[in-house]
């Protein structure tokens, strides 16, 4: 079984990763989903984490970009009605999370055989 850490670069996934390494837990791969709209500092942080832990973080990307889904994607809305683009993501319309993070992750994990996925989530 493969042990895969889902790394967002945020405080919770960074802390989880470092704690797992400190405890000597098995980690076969570390994955990061790049939305294409990350702050430049996020890439710097990822590079620093890679250097600190001495391991490569695998970057996953969706097949289509944020800009495509935001403005170009054609979606149907019932009987013959169509609209173009999802527009700004909102709390109740989280297309960005689903299309740019969850779906690429699911697709990748499906190709890995048996796995355990680790996700850092704050307890509060």
Where are these regions (language model features)?
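ATP-dependent adenylation/nucleotidyltransferase module used to activate substrates
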Residues: 1-124
């Amino acid at each position: 079984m493969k042990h895969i850490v889902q790394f967002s670069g945020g405080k919770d996934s960074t802390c989880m990763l470092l704690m797992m390494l400190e405890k000597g837990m098995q980690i076969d791969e570390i994955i990061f989903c790049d939305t294409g709209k990350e702050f430049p500092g996020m890439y710097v942080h990822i590079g620093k984490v890679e250097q600190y832990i001495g391991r490569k973080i695998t970057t996953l990307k969706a097949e289509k970009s944020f800009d495509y889904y935001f403005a170009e994607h054609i979606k149907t809305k019932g009987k013959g009605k169509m609209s173009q683009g999802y527009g700004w993501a909102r709390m109740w319309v989280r297309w960005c999370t689903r299309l740019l993070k969850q779906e690429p992750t699911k697709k990748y994990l499906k190709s890995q055989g048996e796995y355990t996925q680790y996700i850092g989530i704050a307890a509060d």
